[in-house]
């Protein structure tokens, strides 16, 4: 059994995307809840070792993933709203498309969920986050009562 000999597990509750099904979010709140429930309640992982993975990037749905994944900071620079979870963006040679990401509202909900039933959150990757008041890491820290 692996659980007793590992300090923590990063549960990657993201990248659940489709290249053929449009309007599918790759990392919504429901997926976070489902993943934590599966590992803690179904597989028996100690909640004290379960760390919820949160993305600081967005993915489109229903189109190729090549050169269409954008950092959260890039999404905001193209007019994305830090409180929402989708935006219409443009990535170079592609026409405008909808990208799905976690805004501050969803990150706060996920941070609260992870604080309530697990050991916290981790982000993939910090450099993709916004460096200002729109920061996802700051939103999570504020939610769980930690300094940023």
Question: For the regions a protein language model found, what residue spans apply to each?
Answer:
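Glycan-binding loop/region signatures in secreted carbohydrate-active enzymes
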Residues: 47-117, 138-148
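Hydrophobic residues within beta-strands of alpha/beta enzymes
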Residues: 9, 121-122
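Stable alpha-helical elements in mature extracytoplasmic
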Residues: 2-5, 28-36, 103, 107-110, ...
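A recurrent domain-boundary module in secreted/ectodomain proteins
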Residues: 122, 127-148
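Acidic-and-aromatic substrate-binding clefts and catalytic sites of carbohydrate-active enzymes
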Residues: 17, 59-61, 100-102, 127-132
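Substrate-binding surface in catalytic domains of secreted glycosidases
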Residues: 1-81
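Second-shell loop/turn segments in exported
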Residues: 20-26, 96-100, 126
């Amino acid at each position: 059994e692996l659980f007793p000999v590992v300090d923590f597990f990063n549960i990657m509750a993201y990248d659940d995307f489709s290249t053929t099904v449009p309007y599918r979010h790759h990392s919504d709140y429901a997926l976070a809840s489902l993943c934590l429930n599966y590992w803690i309640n179904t597989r028996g992982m100690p909640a004290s070792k379960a760390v919820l993975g949160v993305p600081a990037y967005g993915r489109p749905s229903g189109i190729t993933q090549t050169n269409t994944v954008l950092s959260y900071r890039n999404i905001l620079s193209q007019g994305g709203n830090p409180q929402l979870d989708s935006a219409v963006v443009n990535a170079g040679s592609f026409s405008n498309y909808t990208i799905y990401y976690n805004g501050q509202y969803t990150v706060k909900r996920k941070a609260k969920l992870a604080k309530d039933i697990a050991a916290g959150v981790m982000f993939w990757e910090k450099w993709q986050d916004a460096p200002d008041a729109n920061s996802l890491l700051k939103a999570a820290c504020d939610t769980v009562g930690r300094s940023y």
